[in-house]
């Protein structure tokens, strides 16, 4: 089994995209990328835009030879979009996907916006999308719908993915944020070797200490029972999240890392550092409007 993470907050942009290769199959999970429209009252810094472009290019390059595409839910950082925003992966950039098998979160318990995006995507593809929750097929399994964060808070649901080859098991936990024990127990029941999952959103005002404690307990459960736990996404939109990750790593013998570290790279928490990026590298007035029109690029902002 080969696992390659294509994008995540530790790569500088919002994503949870990865490739898993087993035998003749190449499975692309959550092929999307996005940037926060506003953080600290600021639009994305061009350094972040450059990072999002790198993730987009990696996703498009990896589509060659892909046999399966999984979409865990219909947020813009997890799927190609119908040109809603210049920092995402537009469906118009996709190659011909004829012959690729899709595995998707069904239409149940999703927002009206997510339902619209699902419809737009299958209209673009020219065929309907399956509802894959609870399905198993040839080494690939999908969970029933599980909460996007805390249960019964109105944040919708996501679908987790299990990929196995011989004695190796990879689990993509999507955006569960370690805030629902049932979802975590589902992962443990799958007996994972490697888990790639979103950590808790410490940066959000509605995230309370009790939720952080619950997330830590769930993270410890995963870290003690999986050989490698890759925690990223919501967790690393805040610098304190990286310290939370390192504290967790110090509590267990197994490997606990962010996505960049798993791929042998240095973490770049650009989302969390937007304010300091503007202070260190001021952005000319009108740059974002010019970028959207194709009149400005990121060449001067490559790290």
From Swiss-Prot:
Domain of life the protein comes from: Archaea
UniProt xrefs under InterPro entries: RibonucZ/Hydroxyglut_hydro, UPF0173_UPF0282_UlaG_hydrolase, UPF0282_hydrls
Regions that span the bilayer: none
Family: Belongs to the UPF0282 family.
NCBIfam families from the UniProt entry: PRK04286.1-2 (NF003288)
Name of the protein: UPF0282 protein MM_2966
């Amino acid at each position: 089994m080969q696992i390659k993470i294509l994008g995540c907050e530790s790569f500088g942009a919002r994503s949870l995209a990865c490739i898993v290769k087993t035998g003749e199959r190449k499975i692309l999970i959550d092929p999307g990328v996005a940037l926060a429209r506003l953080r600290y009252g600021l639009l994305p810094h061009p350094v972040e835009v450059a990072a999002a472009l790198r993730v987009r290019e990696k996703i498009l390059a990896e589509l060659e030879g892909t046999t399966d595409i999984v979409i865990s839910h219909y947020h813009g950082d997890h799927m190609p979009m119908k040109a809603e925003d210049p920092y995402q992966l537009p469906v118009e950039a996709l190659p011909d996907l004829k012959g690729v098998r899709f595995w998707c979160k069904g239409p149940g318990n999703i927002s009206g916006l997510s339902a619209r995006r699902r419809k737009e995507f299958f209209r673009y593809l020219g065929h309907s999308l399956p509802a894959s929750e609870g399905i198993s097929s040839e080494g690939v399994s999908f969970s029933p719908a599980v909460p996007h964060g805390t249960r019964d808070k109105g944040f919708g649901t996501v679908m987790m993915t299990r990929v196995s080859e011989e004695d190796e098991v990879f689990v993509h936990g999507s955006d569960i944020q370690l805030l629902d024990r049932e979802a975590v127990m589902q992962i443990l029941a799958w007996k994972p070797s490697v888990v790639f999952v979103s950590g808790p959103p410490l940066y959000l005002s509605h995230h309370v200490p009790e939720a952080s404690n619950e997330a830590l307990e769930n993270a410890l459960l995963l870290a003690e029972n999986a050989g490698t736990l890759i925690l990223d996404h919501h967790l690393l939109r805040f610098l304190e999240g990286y310290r939370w990750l390192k504290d967790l790593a110090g509590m267990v013998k197994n490997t606990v890392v962010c996505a960049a570290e798993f791929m042998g790279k240095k973490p770049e928490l650009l989302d969390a550092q937007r304010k300091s990026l503007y202070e260190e590298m001021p952005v000319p007035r009108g740059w974002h409007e010019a970028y959207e029109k194709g009149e400005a690029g990121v060449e001067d902002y490559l790290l």
